[in-house]
A protein has these predicted regions:
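Active-site catalytic loop in hydrolytic enzyme cores
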Residues: 104-175, 188-201, 254-272
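Short beta-strand scaffold segments in enzyme catalytic cores
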Residues: 100, 111-114, 146, 228-231, ...
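Active-site-proximal beta-strand elements of phosphoester/diester hydrolases
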Residues: 16-28, 54, 124, 153-162, ...
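A cross-family glycoside hydrolase active-site/sugar-binding cleft signature
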Residues: 25, 56, 97-101, 182-183, ...
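N-terminal amphipathic/basic-hydrophobic helices that include classical n-h-c signal peptides
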Residues: 1-15
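CN hydrolase (nitrilase-like) catalytic-core segments centered on the catalytic cysteine
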Residues: 81-95, 164-247
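Cys-nucleophile CN-hydrolase/nitrilase-fold catalytic domain and related Cys-dependent amidase chemistry
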Residues: 31, 36, 40-117, 188-209
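Hydrophobic residues at beta-strand termini and immediately following loops
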Residues: 22, 125, 148, 214, ...
């Protein structure tokens, strides 16, 4: 494992991975502003020694990009739209989980693109459960769930409504997942009951593994002012955050595959 990714806070043999959640308002963009905000969040997370950075669903273009008159562009490996994020990952030695619209072989996807700490594109998960709304039906659904060994942690990645279905938790569990990362645009209430019920179900169906929910805030387009980012384990919510735009940081024990934090360390953007 790359030693720079971890902090040895309790002496030899206890290596702690710091994970940052960029709980910002992204829903209506514009894309250029969202990109700047993500880069700002990465820089701030680096100041707090965070080595993984999670963003919400469609953080780059904005979840409401199809209902806005603002310009947007889908990311691809050809158009260099990911380049500034790749450079930031290399500069800060971070792994970025980037919620974005992505196009591959002319097929548009609602994706979580993963960029490695060396600044290279690693892989992506495409949202499999695309709801029939204008905000989502532009994207073709993904076909699979994969588990990747990311810095020694077998990690499954899901996008928002993917987390609603217990069978998706079972699929990543079958592949040996030790951690689930969920990027979301999921306000409370919604059309399928409280989101935390789905997240608990996901954790239980994946053998109780920790589940990290990176949600968003803001009121433009969709009211996410009370949307929660959350950490779960063994089918229960450990702690949550809702409110102002903030970078949220937790400690994760890479060896024991356990969440060490009991609450988020919260850095409000307005306080900087």
């Amino acid at each position: 494992m790359p030693p720079h990714l971890y902090t040895d806070v309790f002496g030899a043999g206890c290596l702690i991975l710091k994970i940052a959640f960029l709980h910002f308002a992204y829903c209506c963009g514009p894309q250029a502003d969202n990109a700047k905000k993500i880069l700002q969040g990465m820089k701030l997370a680096a100041q707090y020694s965070a080595s993984w950075v999670l963003t919400p669903e469609m953080a780059l273009q904005g979840y409401y990009m199809m209902r806005s008159d603002k310009q947007f562009q889908l990311a691809s490996l050809q158009n260099k739209l990911l380049q500034e994020f790749m450079e930031a990952c290399s500069r800060y030695r971070q792994r970025l989980f980037l919620g974005c619209g992505f196009v591959d072989e002319k097929t548009p996807r609602n994706s979580c693109a993963i960029i490695s700490p060396d600044g290279t594109y690693y892989n992506r998960h495409d949202k499999t459960k695309v709801v029939p709304w204008i905000t989502e039906n532009w994207a073709h659904p993904g076909e699979k769930f994969e588990v990747w060994n990311l810095d020694g942690i077998n990690t499954g990645v899901l996008v928002c409504a993917d987390a609603y279905f217990a069978e998706h938790g079972e699929k990543i569990a079958e592949q040996g997942a030790e951690l689930a990362v969920v990027i979301a645009a999921w306000p409370p209430g919604g059309h399928a009951g409280p989101p935390e019920d789905a997240w608990k179900r996901l954790s239980r169906s994946a053998n109780g593994i920790p589940v990290l929910i990176c949600n968003q805030t803001g009121t433009e387009g969709m009211d996410c002012s009370h949307a929660q980012s959350a950490v779960l384990c063994n089918g229960e919510v450990l702690f949550t955050y809702e409110g102002r735009e903030s970078v949220l940081i937790i400690d994760f024990d890479e060896e024991k595959k356990q969440v060490l934090s009991t609450e988020f360390v919260t850095i409000n953007l307005t306080d900087i």
